[in-house]
Amino acid sequence: MQISDAWIRKVFTGRGDVTVEVELTVEDSVTGDVLVTRAAAPAGASRGAHEVLYFPEGGVDAALAAFEKLVAPEIVGLDVTEPYSTDGKLEEVDGTQRFEKIGGAVAIATSFAAAEAGAASLGVPLYSFIGGAYARRLPLPLGNVIGGGKHSRGLGPDIQEFLAMPLNPPDIYTAVYTNVEIHKRVLKYILKVDTSFTGGKNDEGAWTPRISSTTALKILREAAREVSGELGVEVGIGVDVAASSLWNGEKYVYKNEGVERDPREQFEFIAKLIEEYDLVYVEDPFHEEDFQSFAELRDRFKDRLIVGDDLFVTNPERIKKGGKIGAATGVIIKPDQIGTLLRAHQAVSAAREFGMRVIVSHRSGDTEYKTLAHIAVGFGAEVIKTGIMGGERTAKLNELIRIGDYLGKWATITQIRIH
């Protein structure tokens, strides 16, 4: 089936930021059958310096104009059943590595909508269109429980995310339920240390108390142990430090805690957190150019997930650079960081080349679309990072549960062993 019409409009993310939604009409020239698919671009609050440009110069209106003038005329007539044909055309039309002419938001929304159209045209689920007939492994959900940093307007802990993840759940429903229960249980512990807390949540639905990073970890550890004991599911906890947002060029500035740490002090601080709180997952512990510190931490904690987000920005070349020195055991994959599903797939391939685990991730300003769940299964990701609470978060989690039901006895779920 071929694209017969292409539209774009301004819509909003769950954070209230303006983004773009692309709508494609595809038609079978023989039968006359018509399908319509849509997709919107998510938006991040803390963006890596090497990500594609979200909007071209001139903002969202310039993005709309670029789509109507440059993109739509070129993609009409393309066969959506040919994987990545639209993505290739987007790169050809823009002609820059960072999608500076049309913007990454236009590129990823178009890429997603075309993939949805391809799957619908063939009558297969999107995860099968992306990953093939044997895509059947479900990822472990990694959820943001307590929030700080930029996602919480700088009012909570300096570390951006305090995370929970079931490590050995029997199925995807139990995995999601485990995180939900931890999120609920954490509130009880927060109120014990911050009696004035009124239940505020950040962009990703995480609690935002005014507590220190170490207090947040103590609370999360206790809640995770409690839920783990009740459900019989091993639970790991972790952090997304988002260290690039703390780095001033010389030191890591923890404003709320009144502490500045040089690179060596930052390394020892992170190592101490891993040891003291038995962290299984550590994302972006150092700034986005410090590949060597990542490699040193990974070498010291070989059995933990040391993960790069801003370090790699879903860029195959940066992933290869890190892979050659053993900078990480896991890679965050955010398709919008690189602009198309084709490029994101290339990033996954680069990660696999160096034995890294794949964590498909949402953005803090996400949308109600459930595409990410299918991408995670299609890419064979071990982990999906998509929050716990909030409509744009549960949309992905509920879709994973549906995929699990659809796959039935053929479904498997990742198991992670630590220690």
UniProtKB/Swiss-Prot annotation:
Q: Where does Mg(2+) bind?
A: 240, 283, 309
Per the record, its GO cellular-component terms are:
cell surface; extracellular region; phosphopyruvate hydratase complex
Pathways per UniProt:
Carbohydrate degradation; glycolysis; pyruvate from D-glyceraldehyde 3-phosphate: step 4/5
Q: Which residues form the active site?
A: 204, 334
Compartment(s) where it occurs, according to its Swiss-Prot or TrEMBL record: Cytoplasm; Secreted; Cell surface
Q: Which reaction does it catalyse?
A: (2R)-2-phosphoglycerate = phosphoenolpyruvate + H2O
The EC number(s) this enzyme carries? 4.2.1.11
Primary site of residence: cytoplasm
Query: What are the alphabetically sorted keywords of the record?
Result: Cytoplasm, Glycolysis, Lyase, Magnesium, Metal-binding, Secreted
Q: Which SMART domains match?
A: Enolase_C, Enolase_N
Q: Name one Pfam family in it.
A: Enolase_N
GO molecular function, one example?
Answer: phosphopyruvate hydratase activity
Report the co-factor binding details. Answer: Binds a second Mg(2+) ion via substrate during catalysis.
Q: Which cofactor does it need?
A: Mg(2+)
Q: Which SUPFAM superfamilies match?
A: Enolase C-terminal domain-like (SSF51604), Enolase N-terminal domain-like (SSF54826)
Which residues of the sequence carry a binding annotation for (2R)-2-phosphoglycerate?
Answer: 160, 334, 363-364, 385
- Give the source's domain of life in one word: Archaea
What's an example Gene Ontology biological process for this entry?
A: glycolytic process
Q: What does this protein do?
A: Catalyzes the reversible conversion of 2-phosphoglycerate (2-PG) into phosphoenolpyruvate (PEP). It is essential for the degradation of carbohydrates via glycolysis.
The record's comment on protein family reads: Belongs to the enolase family.
What is the protein name given in its UniProt record?
Enolase
Provide the taxonomic classification.
Archaea, Thermoproteota, Thermoprotei, Thermoproteales, Thermoproteaceae
